[in-house]
């Protein structure tokens, strides 16, 4: 041993050497091994050092130490010697899984695991179900405070949720294996009769969508008309008010409305009105001057600035102009957006063979 005995006042060097020798030869039962590993660790010997001297790996040390503690709690609970002998022979991995339970629960679960000859994975499932069962504010109808009923309840609950017949059947069989009380068994057996019943049809998914962007919802703009247009036609258009969150519009006036994507310019317009006119009557700089465009003007903006186009009162008609200086004509509205129609794509062109010039 390389460990310094001075750091180990409870176990002398000779005693530690004897413990290591005993572990090396695996003398006694795993319960004894767990106690000896715990003695050495409490005395300051590291798990790696114990492994190097005895061959007990770190994981194995932890398992037998914890399992031996569970075993001792069973002894204190007065468990029958037949059960204790069963676990010494060896079932350390099974008792290790009962560590999450209190002493009384361990005693009951240990008897159940012994009677059903459970493997470690089954004991783990039993302990977890028993622990969670204890968290319930009241016992489910038909089930008792027993680990077998606790696991049977888990199987019963899961089986009711399963539509897959093999999985549902497997859970029912498992629940019947562990059911402790007659009422619990009866509740699970009832699921067997339900296997042949026609399952109720599940309601289809609701086609729910959510507007993520403002542009996904169009804003309805009242239409004043098409050029040539009188000033009174622009002024007479009734404003529209949209009610959020869905943009509900109640329109009592006459005429038409047009949907426009809610770009920033449209969102900020306080009193928008739409007008149709040729592109050339907006600006000579626009290509395809004969193309019909949609012009949105804001009647709330009537103060001139040299960075915008305006709808002006020309007497008998209205006109869209940019003015280098403040105009003498009455400003009816400011142009906020000019919208061109989308390009019309002829799908029939895809069916025609390509033609290339020689």
Curated annotation (Swiss-Prot):
Report the subcellular localization.
Cytoplasm
Membrane-crossing residues?
none
Q: Where is this region: N-terminal alpha-helix?
A: 11-194
Q: Name one Pfam family in it.
A: Raf1_N
- UniProt cross-references to InterPro entries, sorted A to Z: RAF1, Raf1_C, Raf1_cyn, Raf1_HTH, Raf1_N
Q: Where is this region: C-terminal beta-sheet?
A: 218-344
Mind listing the UniProt keywords for this protein, alphabetically?
Answer: Carbon dioxide fixation, Chaperone, Cytoplasm, Photosynthesis
Q: What is known of its domains?
A: Has 3 domains, the N-terminal alpha-helical domain, an extended flexible linker and the C-terminal beta-sheet domain. The 2 C-terminal beta-sheet domains are swapped and pack against each other to form the dimer interface.
- This chain belongs to the protein called RuBisCO accumulation factor 1
Q: Which species?
A: Synechocystis sp. (strain ATCC 27184 / PCC 6803 / Kazusa)
Source lineage: Bacteria, Bacillati, Cyanobacteriota, Cyanophyceae, Synechococcales
Which gene is the coding source of this polypeptide chain?
raf1
